[in-house]
Amino acid sequence: MSAIPEEFLSTQAQVDEQAIQPFPNSRKIHVAGSRPDIRVPMREITLSDTHTSQGREKNPPLTVYDTSGPYTDPEAKIDIRQGLSELRRNWIEERADTEILSDLSSQYGRQRNADSKLDSLRFAHLRPPRRAKAGHNVSQMHYARQGIITPEMEFIAIRENQRLEQYREQLAQHHPGQSFGAHLPSRLTPEFVRSEVARGRAIIPANINHTELEPMIIGRNFLVKINANIGNSAVTSSIAEEVDKMTWAIRWGADTVMDLSTGKNIHETREWIVRNSPVPIGTVPIYQALEKVGGKAEELTWEIFRDTLIEQAEQGVDYFTIHAGVRLAYVPLTAKRLTGIVSRGGSIMAKWCLAHHTESFLYTHFEEICEIMKAYDVSFSLGDGLRPGSLADANDAAQFAELETLGELTEIAWKHDVQTMIEGPGHVPMHLIKENMDKQLACCGEAPFYTLGPLTTDIAPGYDHITSGIGAAMIGWYGTAMLCYVTPKEHLGLPNKNDVKEGIITYKIAAHAADLAKGHPSAQIRDNAMSKARFEFRWEDQFNIGLDPDQAREYHDETLPKDSAKVAHFCSMCGPQFCSMKISQDVREYAKQKGLKHHTALEQGMAEKAQEFREKGAEIYHET
């Protein structure tokens, strides 16, 4: 899509071809729910047969969680100028608690729509916004607390289970894990989803104006999720590039995407992204509000911010990062820090508080913000504006003072049945990570934790996807529900598509490692399938089971490029004579032939190999 000039965007925009290619040996499947319009997408990987001395053994296909939406479905017709189909429209309409507005409620939104100079880059098929009817609350938390299981909740239960019942045999070898108090049922039910949302331990980010959304859940007792950040700046990127980044991010496994645009045409960029996104979209509304006052934080007002919230809610943004915990009294606590306030949103609000010498309007108007959130079912992501920006500042008084305030604000949000998660650090050495998780659980009533890493060392610019991936795996194990990815460009510049992919793969590894360590019931299925394929030298299956089949195949072919190497019973690491797995297979075959038990065969086989070694001259190395 990025090759299209913006003046022709509305008529000529095309989807990124790389983003819509099906994964090798994979197909999109849909698991049916209790009603015809609940069809949960998953990816099924076809596996090759196992070859044994007794013949062939079938390996069942492997089902994996899929965030790519219809983009990787060859049967789907993708036209980003039209947007995705409205999966949730009927579910929302049948609840009969919303109304379609005759016009946008936001003054800024109306101004943008009336500006004919924007016609060429505006998404052409704008829909009138939807809002809760007077006196109604349309949040998934509100429904859950009424005892209602919504179609979204059933969709999520099916999605999280990943057809687990079909893989019980593959889980014969399964580590129970250490969950640190999380409750991970052996099978998720819609009722369990409802109860977790009602309790506030999980959120379903699903704005009523984002009808294209495939429902997902963020919570400690579910699969660990990851978020990918995209967004333009004043110096780089276009609408087309940001849509490409979104489709690219969800291909590789982003569960949500945050649009952090601060450049031109923020409103139009967001519309294109939301209309074409099957995953929840988050934003930091204060960024756009700041642009509306020319970048001068002290000129921000509650009225401008309120209008921005409504503008974005009516476009379909699913969760807002709001830095309402940055209070005037906490700003001096950052004075002796090595790196001060590093959160963009936090620094904006700190500057406003100091300029006006009063509490932040985000804090004083918090209940009014809740009224807006529940009218559209936008979830809170309560921002950590005072997070540490260096190891030296980790776990200090400013960070934890804000966290305690976020806990108080969570209780207020829950009083309004508004879904809420809490953002966390940041830069934290490994031995201080668990304290962050424990304190968040205690302060915030087990609301989902959403962390940026944390980075475990500050010495590796260019490799902060690794320094943070270490911390992400740890804090995910301890109970964090969603991990915000870090790319190799962190602290250095805006990421491109390759950086986005590398950050996502790194964080998919971290999230999956956390699921394994927690003992999530379905997590080890994929690992066991990979291990079996590896032991049986099913190279194509190894590539395809992996998170990045393209790179796995490329690395293999660098040293063994011929097709024959993809059926060889060795790799380039050890070669044909020293492959440990090949030796183990030989021992098993020897045991079958001799009618021996495995350990007896091993002893006898080793004796025969020793005799063979001596007869060949007892030389360690031979010419080949």
Curated annotation (Swiss-Prot):
InterPro entries (alphabetical): ThiC (IPR037509), ThiC-associated_dom (IPR025747), ThiC/Bza_core_dom (IPR038521), ThiC/BzaA/B (IPR002817)
Residues that bind [4Fe-4S] cluster = C571, C574, C579
Pfam families attached here?
ThiC-associated, ThiC_Rad_SAM
**Any one cellular component term from GO for this entry?**
cytosol
Disulfide bonds, which pairs?
none
* Pathway assigned to this chain's UniProt record: Cofactor biosynthesis; thiamine diphosphate biosynthesis
Name the domain of life: Bacteria
UniProt cofactor note: Binds 1 [4Fe-4S] cluster per subunit. The cluster is coordinated with 3 cysteines and an exchangeable S-adenosyl-L-methionine.
Show the catalytic activity: 5-amino-1-(5-phospho-beta-D-ribosyl)imidazole + S-adenosyl-L-methionine = 4-amino-2-methyl-5-(phosphooxymethyl)pyrimidine + CO + 5'-deoxyadenosine + formate + L-methionine + 3 H(+)
Q: Does the keyword S-adenosyl-L-methionine apply?
A: yes
Q: Which residues bind substrate?
A: N229, M258, Y287, H323, S343, R344, G345, D384, G385, L386, R387, E423, Y450
EC assignment: the record states 4.1.99.17
Q: What is a GO molecular function of this protein?
A: carbon-carbon lyase activity
**Chain segments carrying region Disordered:** 48-70
Question: Could you tell me what this protein does?
Answer: Catalyzes the synthesis of the hydroxymethylpyrimidine phosphate (HMP-P) moiety of thiamine from aminoimidazole ribotide (AIR) in a radical S-adenosyl-L-methionine (SAM)-dependent reaction.
Subunit structure of this entry? Answer: Homodimer.
Question: Which PANTHER family does the UniProt record give?
Answer: PHOSPHOMETHYLPYRIMIDINE SYNTHASE, CHLOROPLASTIC, THIAMINE BIOSYNTHESIS PROTEIN THIC
The entry's protein name is: Phosphomethylpyrimidine synthase
Q: Which organism is it from?
A: Nitrosococcus oceani (strain ATCC 19707 / BCRC 17464 / JCM 30415 / NCIMB 11848 / C-107)
Q: What is the lineage of its organism?
A: Bacteria, Pseudomonadati, Pseudomonadota, Gammaproteobacteria, Chromatiales
Q: Which gene encodes it?
A: thiC
